[in-house]
Amino acid sequence: MIDTTRYPRLSRIHTPDDLRRFDEAELTVIAEELRSYLIESVGKSGGHFAAGLGVIELTVALHYLYQTPVDQLVWDVGHQTYPHKILTGRRDQIHTVKQKDGVAPFPKREESVYDTFGVGHSSTSISAALGMAIAAQRNGDDRKVVAVIGDGAMTAGMVYEALNHAGGMDPEPNLLVILNDNRMSISEAVGGLTKMLGRASGSRTLNAIREGGKKILGDKKNNPTARFVRRWEEHWKGMFVPSTLFEEMGFHYTGPIDGHDLPRLVGALKTLQTLKGPQLLHVITTKGKGYELAEGDQIGYHAVSPFDPSKGLVAKGGAKKPTYTDVFSDWVCDMAAAEPKLLVITPAMREGSGLVRFSKEYPQRYFDVAIAEQHAVTLAAGMATQGAKPVVAIYSTFLQRGYDQLVHDVAVQQLDVLFAIDRGGVVGPDGATHAGNLDLSFLRCVPHMVVMAPADEAECRQMLSTGMQYQGPAAVRYPRGTGPGAALDSSLATLPIGKAQLRHSGTRIALLGFGATVDAAEAVGRDLGLTVVNMRFVKPLDKAMLLELAKTHEGFVTIEDNVVAGGAGSGVSELLNAEAITLPMLHLGLPDSFQHHASREDLLAEAGIDQAGIRTAVLKRWPQLMTGKTPSLNAAAG
């Protein structure tokens, strides 16, 4: 429970209605309490940190002035919504964020009426908010709709599709877009738009006028002259800053204003509430505001494990087991030294995809295209037409956003593009919007694609080299976190395409493991005396090995950390069916549902694709396999 002594006002806020009972003069103190509570809570639980600290004042102002949940707030991405959750009935549960059955890390409609739209991916807020505004207009509702979007998210194309639509509508929608400009996405924001927005807050002429006004007016911030000057300043900015872009698209532009100046923020929002038609308010904020260490390291404090706020993040001592991301990071630098045609593209995920070292060692061969997955894939296709060997480093969940380009621009033309797909399969605490549980299904159906899934770290390196050597589109899909700990070297050895690896020769049943499931499958197979195969390739499958095993085994079990529907197991069934082979099959994988937020271990166990789950499923289907087993093994099966 919240400490009422430390948080005398926040402890009285259970819903925004409670917030609106306070005097406006108390909002600054409430914001201070909210910021302190967020630091304390996330310090204990871990989670997204710096983004929420940057919107404390904005969150308080919005819930104070707008009649939520009747008026609707749509948050882009959702990294910044912990303060929103605290003010909307989840204050005492916020310490459970990202945990199984705890508070979701992103807005989730099933969780709260105040979470108006489920998010996790970037740049969707304006489209969703416009849809809500149109529906309200058609229903005769006078509700207001607000979209809050960061400058990093403004780099995605669908933002401008939505702005273009909203600005040209008749009748005009009752829509406010708030541009939360902190010069960041997860990594530093990049591109021409970011530079333009930077000029908005850094104009020398504008700053000189502002400072001169301060000297004349002194501390008299609320006298009529001061209020007139502030209004004049907001219009004057249009001569120096990006208002023209938004005005030309049909939006009335206000700003930029200090997003941490709560009285001024409240004043601007009050004015905007009286205006009709699409509005855009540009606020300047600092990611990590109020916690000095986060302000100084906005990337490092974007998302944190539990830590002591009085000390900050502390590096763990001892040798660190490399993650699959680390394996890719080392490989891409090694391959770049050997292959001068290699170029790397990432959509705003330099740190997450393991490209910090590469970006420093090969800056002229590194392309961060911002949050623009569609552009990233077609950019790679264009490079490939000119003989380059592009690598697209991308999370599985974000590749969904570039799927048309993968098919239309890369695969149809059989171009040499390698997709290094991180966070494949079960991802864990970030929930459904960040899961990689669909990729094997949507990749294996694409003609000309080679699709690989490594069982360990060494195999990941080999597959990346194989994909680089392959003449055509290839994908290496690897999981979040660490692998089993295979020995690594700096070689760039390749694998024969479409050839599986026999891990254990047994009898009766063959366990066919794909990717991260192979180790668990091997443990079960050795225990029960079954054949175990590391399939390696989802496409093409090792047809020769599968047909040979079908002659000598009574059944197949396929195991994958992907949805069963259309996945690797489906490919095995299709291959046998094409050869008119009838064989009992058991497909183990992820269910036909979206993953909730929980630990990776919990989710694998729930799906029955950890060691215990595989063993139980196999023995349930073929109970005769227990014949002759010891009681201890029988007990383990339960």
Swiss-Prot record:
Key words, A-Z: Isoprene biosynthesis, Magnesium, Metal-binding, Thiamine biosynthesis, Thiamine pyrophosphate, Transferase
Catalytic activity, EC: 2.2.1.7
Subunit comment: Homodimer.
Pathway: Metabolic intermediate biosynthesis; 1-deoxy-D-xylulose 5-phosphate biosynthesis; 1-deoxy-D-xylulose 5-phosphate from D-glyceraldehyde 3-phosphate and pyruvate: step 1/1
Top class in the EC scheme: transferase
GO BP annotations listed: 1-deoxy-D-xylulose 5-phosphate biosynthetic process; isopentenyl diphosphate biosynthetic process, methylerythritol 4-phosphate pathway; terpenoid biosynthetic process; thiamine biosynthetic process
PANTHER family: 1-D-DEOXYXYLULOSE 5-PHOSPHATE SYNTHASE-RELATED (PTHR43322), 1-DEOXY-D-XYLULOSE-5-PHOSPHATE SYNTHASE, CHLOROPLASTIC (PTHR43322:SF5)
Catalytic activity field: D-glyceraldehyde 3-phosphate + pyruvate + H(+) = 1-deoxy-D-xylulose 5-phosphate + CO2
GO MF term set: 1-deoxy-D-xylulose-5-phosphate synthase activity; magnesium ion binding; thiamine pyrophosphate binding
Cited function: Catalyzes the acyloin condensation reaction between C atoms 2 and 3 of pyruvate and glyceraldehyde 3-phosphate to yield 1-deoxy-D-xylulose-5-phosphate (DXP).
Positions with a binding annotation for thiamine diphosphate: 79, 120-122, 152-153, 182, 291, 373
Cofactor(s) listed in the protein's UniProt record: Mg(2+); thiamine diphosphate
Co-factor remark: Binds 1 Mg(2+) ion per subunit.
Positions that bind Mg(2+): 151, 182
NCBIfam families assigned to the protein according to its UniProt record, in alphabetical order: dxs, PRK05444.2-2
GO cellular component: cytosol
Name listed for the protein in its UniProt record: 1-deoxy-D-xylulose-5-phosphate synthase
Keyword Cell division: no
Family: Belongs to the transketolase family. DXPS subfamily.
Pfam families the record matches: DXP_synthase_N, Transket_pyr, Transketolase_C
